[in-house]
Amino acid sequence: RDLMSQSRTREILTKTTVDHMAIIKKYTSGRQEKNPALRMKWMMAMKYPITADKRIMEMIPERNEQGQTLWSKTNDAGSDRVMVSPLAVTWWNRNGPTTSTVHYPKVYKTYFEKVERLKHGTFGPVHFRNQVKIRRRVDINPGHADLSAKEAQDVIMEVVFPNEVGARILTSESQLTITKEKKEELQDCKIAPLMVAYMLERELVRKTRFLPVAGGTSSVYIEVLHLTQGTCWEQMYTPGGEVRNDDVDQSLIIAARNIVRRATVSADPLASLLEMCHSTQIGGIRMVDILRQNPTEEQAVDICKAAMGLRISSSFSFGGFTFKRTSGSSVKKEEEVLTGNLQTLKIRVHEGYEEFTMVGRRATAILRKATRRLIQLIVSGRDEQSIAEAIIVAMVFSQEDCMIKAVRGDLNFVNRANQRLNPMHQLLRHFQKDAKVLFQNWGIEPIDNVMGMVGILPDMTPSTEMSLRGVRVSKMGVDEYSSTERVIVSIDRFLRVRDQRGNVLLSPEEVSETQGTEKLTITYSSSMMWEINGPESVLVNTYQWIIRNWETVKIQWSQDPTMLYNKMEFEPFQSLVPKAARGQYSGFVRTLFQQMRDVLGTFDTVQIIKLLPFAAAPPEQSRMQFSSLTVNVRGSGMRILVRGNSPVFNYNKATKRLTVLGKDAGALTEDPDEGTAGVESAVLRGFLILGKEDKRYGPALSINELINLAKGEKANVLIGQGDVVLVMKRKRDSS
């Protein structure tokens, strides 16, 4: 009526033809609804907008309690279905058959967990301020495992469609565990298999998106991104729970940093790094398995991946910033330059015009440079400090002469292994400590008024008139490099990672020194990591290792002591022994051991275990005798008595257990009683004692009759106070 009362609309409604073919085609071709909202409106205005299977007539009454009709006897035109009222849905929801809900929380696990996190999360106040968002690749799917798409597909097929044809290879540990777990959970599950498959995919695969983010990037923050940051506002939020995938990422970074730092100071960094990666577990899963599946990009993690022969991102790292070249090219030439202190540095100069994006945790920038010249640097960051960090890194990276001339004093920074850093890192460390001279000498220039950009003065204050030459501060962040492309890299024994053109992408100098506490338990089985928990842990672990491996240690002690002394498991222990005493202690203990080997019946298991770690240092020949040996633990020197117990090393004869600094270090399986009872493991020169008497080898010989044995031949021999033991003549002569 309304429309007909207005002349213009009446004209349209009465005169306009609707038989225009194009229009009819537009709204009728294809199965896709062209105007869903409108369709919904006029459908719901009808009495029976829904169609249902004929069986519904047996399952639902014709009228509800209020007497309203629930279905019509008319068939749906063009199909064998009944027309049904929306009220029927209400009736069904209230009175329809119920089904077991036990599987819902299991199948829709990710949703149920999300609800819990939001329920227990805390939303703080809303602040209005400019948001510097930068696009980063983020994990949008909390609570997932880290399977590859293919691995997940095999697991899903095996769980949801176990009888389908097709080869499925479940190889990795995580695949097998998940499959077993899910099959048990989903027994007799009535939820549509396709739905279950979709939900499993959410649980198994990491989904990433390239999204603008200003705050936290872990998946529990990303799931509420739309609630926590807009264009000009942010809302504080603390998640109401953590998810394993974020914990894995965080713990992986900590483990990788610890391992790289430790490997740097060992004799063969690369071999040590690999040994540690292979023997470390994070939250009960092997670190190498996590590295293969986890896409986290962080300097230490990438060094570990490179060592394992995995591909990594082609961007490179300098001063804690990720650099990605976006255009231009350069060749590298060695050049000698003089610092302000007239020290000569050999630097690899990049000749040519290049543009880079620089992305750090708290600042980002665009850098344009020519040979040893910064042309333009546009920085944005969270605060003055972060912006200054980015400017320093870019100035050093530019290799400009005024930067090198700004050096005051000598450059002699060393890494953890006491090796001098390369010149570029020398310069970086120097200016990171104090950049005053650098900023003062850089030069300033007047600036034009450009929207969203301000200048920055040498004292790091903003200005609209002047700015450091070539440097501007922007309100907008620079997006992270979005590509997930991975390249083949090589790594040398000093853990420098290069791409195939030989450019250094990463080196241990780039690994952050930040210490954190891991969310998941990291178990380092490698002896190289014993010291991470301090000297006490080194002491306990060393003795635990000897006791665990006592059977082999015992044989080596008598046959091949040099090989035993050189075992890497004794390396950490040396740091506990006062430097001046190491050689003397070692000489003393080795002499003592040799006497034990030579003189029958003086073999004393406990004493060997106690003194063995001291014999690992290069020995000094001296006539020094010691009644106690000092180790530095608990901030002071503590004594280990050569004969007898002490708080550091205490063996309880009754329980046969050893405690080191009050911590249990294990039990000795054989009877290490002093004197004759220990004679079974005593060592005869030229013979190996195998154990108790074995009648198969004939009657006991006296010690003098042994001379007639051939090499490798076994015999029973009578020694000491009537003890009979089985011995074998050594295959090679060595005392």
Curated annotation (Swiss-Prot):
The keyword Hydrolase does not apply. A motif (Nuclear localization signal) lies at residues 729-732. Its main location: virion. Disulfide bonds: none annotated. Keywords: Cap snatching, Eukaryotic host gene expression shutoff by virus, Eukaryotic host transcription shutoff by virus, Host gene expression shutoff by virus, Host mitochondrion, Host nucleus, Host-virus interaction, Inhibition of host innate immune response by virus, Inhibition of host MAVS by virus, Inhibition of host RLR pathway by virus, Inhibition of host RNA polymerase II by virus, mRNA capping, mRNA processing, Viral immunoevasion, Viral transcription, Virion. It is found in: Virion; Host nucleus; Host mitochondrion. One of its GO terms (molecular function) is RNA binding. The keyword Transmembrane helix does not apply. One of its GO terms (biological process) is 7-methylguanosine mRNA capping. GO terms for cellular component: host cell mitochondrion; host cell nucleus; virion component. SUPFAM superfamilies: PB2 C-terminal domain-like. Transmembrane segments: none annotated. Belongs to the influenza viruses PB2 family. Plays an essential role in transcription initiation and cap-stealing mechanism, in which cellular capped pre-mRNAs are used to generate primers for viral transcription. Binds the cap of the target pre-RNA which is subsequently cleaved after 10-13 nucleotides by PA. Plays a role in the initiation of the viral genome replication and modulates the activity of the ribonucleoprotein (RNP) complex. In addition, participates in the inhibition of type I interferon induction through interaction with the host mitochondrial antiviral signaling protein MAVS. Influenza RNA polymerase is composed of three subunits: PB1, PB2 and PA. Interacts (via N-terminus) with PB1 (via C-terminus). Interacts with nucleoprotein NP (via N-terminus). Interacts (via N-terminus) with host MAVS (via N-terminus); this interaction inhibits host innate immune response. This is Polymerase basic protein 2. It comes from Influenza A virus (strain A/Silky Chicken/Hong Kong/SF189/2001 H5N1 genotype A). The gene is PB2.
